[in-house]
Every structure is written in structure tokens, then in C-alpha cells.
Amino acid sequence: MRRASLLAILALVLAYASVAQGGGANQLAHFSLVRALTHGTAQVDSYHWETKDLSWYHRHYYSSKAPGLAFILVGPYYVLDRSGALGLLSRVTGATETAVALWILGLIGAVIPTGILLLLLRRVGDELEPGFGTITAVTAGAATLLFPFATLLFDHALSTALGFAAFVLVWRAADRLLPYALGGLVGGFAITSEYPLALVAGAVGLYAISKGAALRRGAAYAAGVVLGVLPLLVYDWLAFGSPLHLSYANAIVRQGVTGHDVLGANEKGLFGVSTPHRGTAEQLLFSRIGLVTVTPVVVAGAIGLFLLWRSGWRREAALAGGLCAAFVVYNAGYATPFGGGTPGPRFLIPMLPFVALGFATAYRAWPWATIGVAVPSAVIMLGVTATNPIRATTWHWVDRVTDGSFTGSGIWPKLPLAVFVVTSVVLCWRVTPIGRPRVRDAVAALLSLGAYLVIAFAGPRLVGTNPKLLAAIFVALLAGVSLWHIGLHRGGRSRAASG
């Protein structure tokens, strides 16, 4: 059983590694900083024409990205470049050196961190609901935005893994102070890798002191956080002359001829974050690429968090629910809430492992209803990943699947991706204690799938015109599915009592 469980996660990791997604401004902004650091500078003047995700300061270009991912990758890239391996692989594969480098660095900076995250989710899921850790991890890895972004050299995979690892360290710390300090260190480096992870680091800190001995544990955790953000402070000091000058400052809005015609991309509010808007929050959840629209399984996760609270894991459920709310509120106040070319609201990715904590209890309580929303989530995520997630800002990826073009090279290069995902699902099914479906199970799955289809159709049409009607439909559908399961549960207890 343990071997099949690990193989299920390994199959997903191989699925991530089987695709190379090419360039894009975000990936190339990270890559430009990696290359600059190998030459001992943070200035990306030599590469500024490759990307628009830049800042301009004292007549020089800088990547507007947090430097944590580049810190991890600078050593491997230096070896690849100086050894001539990049040139050799480029000649062998026929791809450009940049494409080869993005794929290899993506393995280190995105694929491996996501694999570690899934292992952590498996372990925590099994603690919360024995036997349901593997399906928790596989659902998170195949049916949420973690899937496409595990194949891209963005900072989300690394920072999200670090943020959740900080929680796991504190969660298992018991009476020892060292795990609290290590949790703080990991949480601090998550901030160094993606600034909004301060929300996760702060929330995990509150969770740490809620476990008792608040002063000692809080101090150990805080000391770790300081050490974790120290590389960021040193980088800012050396690059910009001040430890408090973040790369978000002086971000370029429009490049123009000079490359910095208009500055101030993040000047509104605090680095682009101002007063949250309810309409933006609705868009983040229910628009054409809203979180619920493209990955409806998160609704099952949210319900699972409520069930987790009721089962006695109250601190953990409160942490997860609070983080989800915090990220939606923060993102609803951000100037570019969807973050450009993306298959969904990518700035919400750091909260997804915490939503996934609810998958274990959801599968335990309502297995087939959860499967009913997990399947379309996985199909959509597989589709956008196979057709390049950066191009999935609309649902035109469906056309690229149906016409067989995918990313322009046809279906054959994408077959390993699909095979590995299917293999992972099959192995996961073998180790998960969910029996064969009965008639009522099939009805439950169809009810949840039908509810999703209604929301997927109505949501994008009502989100900007009649949000109250959308909310009423969503609540009614949720109540209907819930009442069905409550009725089944009571009916089962009545039959057991009469027997």
C-alpha cells in the first residue's frame, strides 16, 4: 500500500517533468535574474528586452520578482552554463539554450518543490483521516492550480511548498523549540521567494503560539522568520542600497522604445494592494477563469474544512479557513488580480494546500460527491497544462485539444503527461478506502457534477451583472447537495437501528 501511494505521487511528478512550457514574461524575468546573479549582479540590463516584468532604478533594469527562486537556481545554472551542458543539450534536442535552461531549472524550482508538497499533504491527510492522505495529495496535485504551475518557472510552486512546510514543522513540533525555529526559517524564506507569503508565515506564527507556551514558541518561530528573510534584506541592500527597497518598487507599466516609458505598476496602495473590492473577489471565484469555475473541487475542500473543525481539528481548520479568506481579500485589492496570462487566479495558489486539508475529510464523509467535482477539475487542469497554461486566459484551450494542435506540436508529445496522470489516479484508487459506487453514490456524484455545471454556466454570466442571484444559486445548490447527504446519513442510521 505504501509503495503504491508513493508511486502515485511519483507518477504526478513525472507528469510535471514531461512537459516544457517555453518562455513568457514571468519565466524569463526569473531566468534573467538567475543569469545576472551568476555574473555577480542583480542588474538585468543585458536581458531586459526578453521580458516586461522589470523594474527601473537608478538607470538600470532589475527583475521585479522576489529573489528566493533565483537564489535556489543560481548554482545549478552556473554549473550547466559553465560546463557546456546547456549547449550540448540544445544541440541534441534542437531546442534553444533558453528553452533547455527553463525546463531544467523548472525541474529544480517547480517540479521538485511540488513533489515535496504532495508528500507533505499525503502525510498530513493520513493523520487527519487515516487512509485518505494519498487521495488528498493526488487531488491537490492533479485537480488544482498546483498542476499547471508545477510545469512553469514561476515562484508559486517553491513559495507554496515552503509555506506549507512551515505549517507542517510547527504542527508536528510538540514541546521542542527547534521545529518552531525551523518552521519560522522556512516561512521566512517563503517570503523571500514570494512576498505575499508573509500572510502564510504570519498565520503559522499565530498557530504556533496558539499551541501554548506562547512566548517561548513565538520567539523561536520569529527568530527563524528573521533568518529566513535575511537573504532578501541583504539582496535589497546590495541591489538597491536599502534593505527595505523591494523589487516591486519602480515596476515598469509599459516598456515603450526605451523599455521604461511608464513606471509605477505597483504604486497603487501598498505595492499594488489597496482596498479590496467585492466585485473583484466574485471575479476571482466565479468568472470564466475563477477558482470555482476551473477547479470546483475547492468547494469540497472548503466543506471539508468545516467538517475538520467539527471533528476536533479546530486550530488547523481555523488556520486553513483564515488563510483562504485572507488570500481572497488580499487578491481582491490587488491591481492585477489574475496576474496576466494564467489559467486561473494564480495569486491564490499559496492557500491551496490549506484548502486541500479539507479534501481528506470531504472524501471520508462524501466520497462520491467529492469525486463528482474532482473529475472535472482534473480534466480542466490537464487540458490547460497540455496546451500551455500561459495561453489559457480563455477557454480556447478546448479548441486546441479538440483540433489536436495542443501547443503546436500535436498530441504525441503530450501523451506521456496524460499517461502519468492516469497512472497516478489508478494507483491512488488502489490505496484509498472508497468502495464501489452504489446507486445512491452515483446520484451523489451526478448531483455535485450537475451543481458545478450550473455554476460554471451561470457564474461568468452573473458575476458582473447580478451577483446576488449568483450567490443565491450557489447557496441553493450547496444546500441541495448537503441535504441529500444528510438524508442518506440519517436513513443509514435508521436502517442500522431497525436491524
Regions found by a protein language model. Give the residues of each.
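Membrane-proximal envelope and lipid/glycan-remodeling enzymes
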Residues: M1-G499
